[in-house]
Regions:
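A glycine/proline-hinged amphipathic helix-loop "lid/cap" segment
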Residues: 1-61, 226-229, 319-321
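Short beta-strand-to-loop junctions in surface cap/lid or active-site-entrance loops
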Residues: 53-65, 240-248
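A fold-wide structural signal in alpha/beta-hydrolase
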Residues: 68, 97-101
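Alpha/beta hydrolase fold serine-hydrolase catalytic domain that processes acyl esters and thioesters
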Residues: 26, 33, 37, 135, ...
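Short beta-strand element of the alpha/beta-hydrolase
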Residues: 65-75
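Catalytic nucleophile-loop/oxyanion-hole region of alpha/beta-hydrolase
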Residues: 81-82, 88, 102-136, 299-305
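Active-site glycine-rich loops that stabilize anionic/oxyanionic intermediates
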Residues: 73-78, 262
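Gly/Ala-rich beta-loop-alpha elbow adjacent to hydrolase catalytic centers
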Residues: 141, 145, 149
């Protein structure tokens, strides 16, 4: 991190001390540290259905036109559980009267790309079949969850270097893509090259570091940590296609992107937002003073309230559009 003072919001400072070190080079330790945070589980206000596939929050007074939100947790593609986001997802279900589905996607390196993306697509497809295809549908992700959100929507739209699939699956994916009204990306983790200025300037974090990112990306793409090889470009292009005119032509949905000023991932989120705009897509980007990686959805914080206001307006605007 920089050697001179960087402003951080005082209300968010406790997160830095409370977050276990993100040791992507020692996954058992990283995962155990995360699991320890579940010692005091959240008591939900809404009905929660739990299965091996994920967690679903359903308001008691569910309206016929209530939105469906697929909320994808973070964890560097290698850690995390759907339960980690219970407080956030419960609050989203209450605020928007929405069905919130949090996929329990499989983690790398045991299940590298594209398996986690496929799991998230399956969760969306199952939710649409169960709750109806007419509901305004949004995809929300945080950090690696935002990367998965971007990957799954790109794949559904048939963008970038696609994995092999038959015509029936491609047609099914296009139908699903047409139902997505918007994509919400919080502090997106979408650039495995680690080549941005912010990835160097904030190499020591706080919370997420350049070393952690390097390990996470190798795990995600099935490259051994100690291998003297780079991640194959074809895999990067398949996972995170660069915005182009094809995005607009294929109907990539409106995007709401939030980045942190103090975050090694900051510049890749900015590049994604401007890339979408330059490609002719609808995109907006926000950056709040003093936020850092992992701080956007701290329960009860002013920051999380501000983020919810953004999401509220974005969901309302795009729910009314067909």
């Amino acid at each position: 991190m920089s050697t001179y003072p960087i402003y951080l919001r005082p209300e968010l400072a406790p997160i830095i001390a409370e977050t276990p070190e993100q040791t992507t080079w020692d996954l058992p330790a990283m995962r155990a540290g995360g699991d320890a945070l579940l010692a005091n589980p959240h008591e939900a206000d809404n009905r929660v259905e739990v299965s091996a596939r994920g967690r679903t929050f359903i308001p008691a007074d569910l309206a016929e036109d209530a939105p469906l939100i697929i909320s994808i947790h973070g964890g560097g593609y290698v850690a995390g559980r759907a339960a980690f986001d219970d407080a956030k997802n419960d609050e989203l279900a209450t605020r928007f009267g929405a069905i919130v589905v949090s996929p329990e996607y499989r983690l790398a390196p045991e299940f590298p790309f594209p398996i986690p993306v496929d799991d998230c697509i399956s969760a969306l497809a199952e939710a649409l079949e169960r709750f109806g295809h007419e509901r305004p549908t949004f995809i929300l992700g945080d950090s690696a969850g935002a990367g998965l959100a971007y990957s799954m929507v790109s794949r559904l739209c048939g963008l970038g270097l696609q994995m092999a699939q038959d015509e029936a699956i491609a047609a099914r994916y296009k139908r699903i893509a047409s139902l997505i009204r918007g994509i919400i990306l919080l502090e997106p983790c979408v650039d495995p090259t680690l080549s941005t200025p912010s990835s160097r300037f904030f190499a020591e974090g706080p919370v997420w570091t350049r070393r952690a990112a390097a390990g996470a990306w190798r795990h995600y793409f099935g490259v051994p940590l100690d291998a003297e090889v780079t991640i194959p470009l074809r895999l990067i292009e398949a996972a995170f296609p660069k915005p182009s005119a094809e995005f607009r032509e294929e109907g990539f949905p409106p995007a709401l992107i939030v980045v942190n000023p103090v975050d090694p991932l900051r510049d890749e989120g900015i590049a994604l937002a401007t890339g979408l705009v330059d490609a002719g897509c609808i995109a907006e980007m926000h950056m709040f003073a003093g936020t850092f990686h992992g701080s956007l959805s701290m329960p009860g914080s002013v920051t999380w309230h501000e983020i919810q206001l953004l999401i509220d307006r974005f969901v309302k605007e795009n729910s009314a559009v067909r």
